[in-house]
């Protein structure tokens, strides 16, 4: 069952900043009217801030829940002077020199004395600026960056693997995956698009002002960003990671051949782990799922670039023995420059006739599922941005022989149970057979990333009145199919600057 938050929990981050329930401070007499204190939540946390606000009010101090023109003293904990100034810039308060910016030690000293203490140098953060590392974004990076020029489409942005905002995008991807498990496509895409935007930024986000004017920054997204800036982590993402349903779905979908529907079915049956599924002999598993469980340990481990290169050599050599003019291209994350992945995708094409099942006779495939082509010539591209293509495909598990390695650190109890040391690894491989004239479109689609492909198709539809999929590009106004012999030609048809594969990690 989906977890329901109790109504007392404030759902929006802005209201959490809002910081305090007025009725808690009712009845306290204000003894020191000349001082108006604001306690920064950044790096302190909401619980501690609430406690300190209540304690100070009980001592007769006037403490504001929100930063306003009446505030005279700003108190911070574990923040340097430059960090406080950075934070103030994002609050649009104008001239910050009117504030006394003080360390938390000043407020605790005041409460111990029961009255305001003198503003000695030791309490002023400006005197302690060197004590803490500053998180300030270099001005040169921000000043040269114009948020309004950031496109809502990732196909108009360049996104390398150098992600300056991983702490935010990791949280977004956890949220998106949870919504995907719940089949809530709208919220899932909201977080994926936001993650895509932040991945393209050339600098780390350290304040809310940094995201002003950026596309795809809705309220839910901004709440998560603000909490991470202030607390260092997202409580919502942590809640998801600890959620029983999410953990089960995450584990179930790691099995080859298991999707959200099957995970939902197993979860409703009371199953929670892969081990529980394997132990339930009443379950009827598909051929693909049986293979997924049989080679589970290998398939859930990462595939290295070296392993991908080794598999690529096997596939190319095998294909070329019966199809000398074939073009075999590794696609997916490895084409975009990634060093690790979970499977390997290959695109295979040839100008001439072809035989598609030769790999099956080489003893290299532990499992394969061939999907025949369903493409109809002159078929209009699909309207759906996530539509499957119609190529002939082979979803396979390949046996990759590996040199023996020193397993001295390996769990000996497990090692002793093995009749012999395994000298191969099962690796997921997708082989996609495409007609030569559709190769450029297939290469663009199968290279990814998934979000880059989505945005490319959205851009074609909404900005160019065209329809794009992995087979073709159709101009609705001219009512013609646009031929392309390369990815560069497709970008040119769409009126886009060419984006290199390693710049498509949206």
Curated annotation (Swiss-Prot):
It is found in: Nucleus. Its cofactor is Mg(2+). One of its GO terms (molecular function) is DNA nucleotidylexotransferase activity. Belongs to the DNA polymerase type-X family. A 2'-deoxyribonucleoside 5'-triphosphate binds at residues 333-338, 342-345, 445-446. It catalyses: DNA(n) + a 2'-deoxyribonucleoside 5'-triphosphate = DNA(n+1) + diphosphate. Keywords: Magnesium, Metal-binding, Nucleotidyltransferase, Nucleus, Terminal addition, Transferase. GO terms for biological process: DNA metabolic process; DNA modification; double-strand break repair via nonhomologous end joining. Pfam families: BRCT (PF00533), DNA_pol_B_palm (PF14792), DNA_pol_B_thumb (PF14791), DNA_pol_lambd_f (PF10391), HHH_8 (PF14716). This is DNA nucleotidylexotransferase. Its main location: nucleus. Residues 27-124 form the BRCT domain. Residues 258-262 are annotated as: Involved in DNA binding. CDD domains: BRCT_DNTT, NT_POLXc. Can also utilize other divalent cations, such as Mn(2+) and Co(2+) (in vitro). Mg(2+) binds at residues 343, 345, 430. A motif (Nuclear localization signal) lies at residues 11-17. Its EC number is 2.7.7.31. Template-independent DNA polymerase which catalyzes the random addition of deoxynucleoside 5'-triphosphate to the 3'-end of a DNA initiator. One of the in vivo functions of this enzyme is the addition of nucleotides at the junction (N region) of rearranged Ig heavy chain and T-cell receptor gene segments during the maturation of B- and T-cells.
């Amino acid at each position: 069952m989906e977890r329901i938050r109790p109504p007392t929990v404030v759902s929006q981050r802005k209201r959490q900043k809002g910081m305090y329930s007025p009725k808690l401070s009712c009845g306290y007499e204000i003894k020191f009217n000349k001082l108006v204190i604001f306690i920064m939540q950044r790096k302190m946390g909401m619980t501690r801030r609430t406690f300190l606000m209540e304690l100070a009010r009980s001592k007769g101090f006037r403490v504001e829940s929100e930063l306003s023109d009446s505030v005279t003293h700003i108190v911070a904990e574990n923040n340097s002077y430059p960090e406080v100034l950075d934070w103030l810039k994002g609050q649009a308060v104008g001239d910050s020199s009117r504030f006394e910016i003080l360390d938390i030690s000043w407020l605790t000293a005041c409460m111990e004395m029961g009255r305001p203490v003198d503003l000695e140098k030791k309490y002023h953060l400006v005197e302690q600026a060197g004590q803490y590392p500053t998180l300030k974004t270099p001005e040169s990076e921000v000043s040269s960056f114009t948020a309004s020029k950031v496109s809502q489409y990732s196909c108009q942005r360049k996104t390398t693997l150098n992600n300056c905002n991983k702490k935010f995008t990791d949280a977004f991807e956890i949220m998106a995956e949870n919504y995907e498990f719940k089949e809530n496509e709208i919220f899932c895409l909201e977080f994926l698009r936001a993650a895509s935007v932040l991945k393209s930024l050339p600098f780390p986000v350290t304040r809310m002002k940094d995201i002003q004017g950026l596309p795809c920054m809705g309220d839910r997204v901004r709440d998560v960003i603000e909490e991470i800036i202030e607390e260092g982590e997202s409580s919502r993402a942590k809640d998801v990671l600890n959620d029983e349903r999410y953990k089960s779905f995450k584990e179930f979908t790691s099995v080859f051949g298991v999707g959200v529907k099957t995970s939902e079915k197993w979860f409703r049956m009371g199953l929670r782990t892969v081990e529980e599924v394997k132990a339930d002999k009443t379950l009827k598993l598909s051929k693909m799922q049986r293979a997924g469980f049989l080679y589970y340990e290998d398939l859930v481990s990462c595939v290295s670039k070296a392993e991908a290169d080794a598999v690529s050599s096997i596939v190319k050599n095998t294909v070329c023995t019966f199809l000398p003019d074939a073009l075999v291209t590794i696609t997916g994350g490895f084409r975009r420059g990634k060093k690790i992945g979970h499977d390997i995708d290959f695109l295979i094409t040839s100008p001439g006739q072809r035989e598609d099942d030769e790999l099956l006779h080489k003893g290299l495939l532990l499992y394969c599922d061939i999907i025949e082509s369903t493409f109809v010539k002159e078929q209009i591209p699909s309207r759906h941005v996530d539509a499957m293509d119609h190529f002939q495909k082979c979803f396979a598990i390949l046996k990759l022989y590996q040199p023996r390695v020193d397993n001295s650190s390996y769990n000996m109890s497990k090692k002793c149970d093995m009749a012999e040391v395994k000298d191969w690894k099962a690796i997921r491989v997708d082989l996609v057979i495409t007609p030569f004239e559709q190769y450029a479109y297939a290469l663009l689609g199968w290279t990814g990333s998934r979000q880059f492909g989505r945005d490319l198709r959205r851009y074609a539809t909404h900005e160019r009145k065209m329809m794009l999929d992995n087979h073709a590009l159709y101009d609705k106004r001219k009512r013609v199919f646009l031929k392309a012999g390369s990815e560069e030609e497709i970008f040119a048809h769409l009126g886009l600057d060419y984006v290199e594969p390693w710049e498509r990690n949206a």
